[in-house]
Amino acid sequence: MIIAERDVIIVGAGPAGSICAAYLAKAGVDVLLLEKDIFPRDKACGDMECEGIVSHMGALGAVEELDALSTCIRNLKLISNRGNETLIPFECYCAPRYELDRILSETAVKHGAELRQSCTVTGLITENDTVTGVRAKYKGEDVTLKSRIVMIADGAFSSLGKSLGIAHEKPYSMWIGDRAYFKNVNLDRSLAKDQYNAYGVFGFSELTGPGYFWVMPVGRDGVRDGICNVGVMVNDLDAYRQADLQERFYKWSGNIPKIGEMFERAVRISPWEGGRMNDISQGVQKAGDGYMVIGDAAALTMPLVHDGLSAAADSAKAAALAALGAFMAGDVSGENLMNEYMRAYKMKSERVTTEQLKLKRLLMESMHDPSVMDKTIELLETDPIYRKSHLKR
């Protein structure tokens, strides 16, 4: 049995884990970043890197590589169940997730973090009800890794979160999705001009209820070769089957003529890959004695309201700042870590969060009626006053 000690151990080298490791290592903290897979590795995702995560990558010196590997989206075309359309301003990068995760893990290492890939964490070590490290399998050996703080960044439906009793599955909090890559998608060349001036499509349909379809050109050759990340995401695990989502996409593309035209010559170049995530209504406890929870494991996002990667990145920096504050105070208690984390992340009060959740449920329920998005998109296109009041400048 190998025993090692670090200031911070981070379980999971996805965006949240790697960004947290980079910030901590940059501040001089001894960080060990553990990842069960080997990079580069693929992961089902919409591949949209919005302003939030991009700002963190800029702060960590990683944005230039992202820029070179991405399509830059300038607008979104929204399409309703009846085929109503409007174009709205929306900016993000679109780079394949396997590239994003590679860039971020390499960035963490450049700043001084130690990365161990193909290292599977099998459990947490606790002493007097405080998390003090992890047990893992690495290169065929059982290892014991001790730390002052453990960051739990093992993704949605966190196995470590479940072992602590802080994450409980709630069907209405779950989102399930499928995505695949297509080539030769017929993009509107007046909107898709080059790598740095492109558009994406979001579709709302009776086929998804509370959810959406997307078509996003991705990577440096997305516009040139019509390479797009194509997918669907729906809310409420009990209402949908994973395998059914692909059928819904093909039915949608057949029902909306302009979408059908986009896929007349398109060829799928990857398998459909499925994924699940929890939204903020799951109510995951974010910290306890000796640990914090970040990224998808913390269930911090609301699809259609926030993007998951930016929420993950924000939580990563907040947890890094909280750890630094805890070390200065010599206090890694759950109460102190939670207070530091909340202050850094600017988490809303319970009252405000409850109101946000009510609005989220209202939005989701309204989307069961496709006429809601039909009318919304119609007004965005035809009513300048409505458009101005509902779109951020």
Regions from the language model: what does each represent?
Residues 2-14:
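Beta1/beta-strand and adjacent pyrophosphate-binding region of the FAD-binding site
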Residues 17-18:
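N-terminal Rossmann-fold NAD(P) dinucleotide-binding loop
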Residues 21, 29-31, 150:
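Hydrophobic anchor at the start of a short beta-strand
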Residues 25-45:
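Glycine-rich FAD pyrophosphate-binding loop
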Residues 52-105:
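A conserved beta-strand/loop capping segment in the N-terminal third of enzymes
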Residues 109-258:
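Predominantly flavin-linked oxidoreductase catalytic cores and closely associated redox partners
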Residues 236-322:
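FAD/FMN-dependent oxidoreductases across multiple families
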Residues 324-393:
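C-terminal helical "tail/cap" subdomain of flavin- and related membrane-associated enzymes
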